[in-house]
Amino acid sequence: MDEVIVEYIRRTVLKIPRDEIMAVLQKWGFLSEAQLQTINFRQTKEGISHSVAQLCEESSADLKQAALLDIIYNHIYPNKRVWSVYHMNKTGEETDFFDFRDFKKKFRRQIQSALINVTINFREYEDNAIWIRIAWGTPYTKPNQYKTSYVVYHSQTPYVFISASVLRSNLPLLCQAMVVASNYHDIHEMELRSHCLNSLKDIVFKRYSQNFQTNYPLQERNVLTENVDLRINDENRSEKERIYRLNQESFGNGPQPKLDFAQYKLETMFKSDPKWDVLEKKEPFRCLVKFSSPHLLESLKSLAPAGLADAPLSPLLTCIPQKARNYFKIREKKSLHPGSFVSP
């Protein structure tokens, strides 16, 4: 058995939380229950990883089994990677019958026609999600199993979730393989990325609580009324109700999808009175603003009720789930009056 494969399996085990190693290995299914019972799971992770590697060596684990363990690990812990959302388009509205075996054949053939040194592994899950693991090599080197790309594709949908490897030069080939295998016409990257794969799915599949104009739900209204200090005057009470209503209209009344950042790029021209001659060159002013939080949308939702921001928040902040993007480019609208200016 290849020592490189044994070491890869050992390192994969090291990434798993110690209390969950047993459960992950059981899902893997390569080692029997009798073999797993011989492992002392109370020892250090280093010791556990060596025990697992030894059993795998005795059982002649191959690259396919090592790749399967890696897929299972990434499926259980998808937040360890950064995922980007891609959208595919068809030329017509017809819906093709999806054949998993045909999909795998086309995908593999498309990539291997351009690059021989590549390993591709598939795993289908109950929610119609196909997980694809690609380890890339070069025309002269073997595939690097530590620099993999991952693709998650739900059949019969136009959305693809890709976590690219550091070898981004292979990304166009990967996208082309997805288009060919799934019988679409083209593919483009959406401006939506996050560590939380499930939240990205919630956004593009519209599975989150969407904003809508409404009065207070009865239960929420009663809770608010019960918690109001009777000494608070009507003006403050009305303001709290206004903030609550606007917040509900902006974010809905359910939990928000989990995103960890939103990025805004501003590009505008510096405007001044022409006679001041402030700028010799008419270069645009560029600015990058990035909001980061373990749960950005919930953090934004809590700003107005906490008195840290005015309600309603800017649409640039509240439109993230509806527009399915957390990367924005803000450019100024062309002025109808070229001579107008804004003083600095």
From Swiss-Prot:
Q: Which Pfam families match?
A: CENP-N
Record keywords: Centromere, Chromosome, Nucleus
- Its domain of life reads Eukaryota
The keyword Cytoplasm appears for this protein: no
- Supply one GO CC term from the record: chromosome, centromeric region
GO BP annotations of the record are: CENP-A containing chromatin assembly; chromosome segregation
* Principal subcellular localisation of the protein: nucleus
Q: Which InterPro entries does the entry link to?
A: CENP-NAC/CAD_complex, Chl4/mis15/CENP-N
PANTHER family, from UniProt?
Answer: CENTROMERE PROTEIN N
Q: Which family does it belong to?
A: Belongs to the CENP-N/CHL4 family.
**What does this protein's UniProt record list under function?**
Probable component of a centromeric complex involved in assembly of kinetochore proteins, mitotic progression and chromosome segregation.
| Name under which the protein is recorded | Centromere protein N
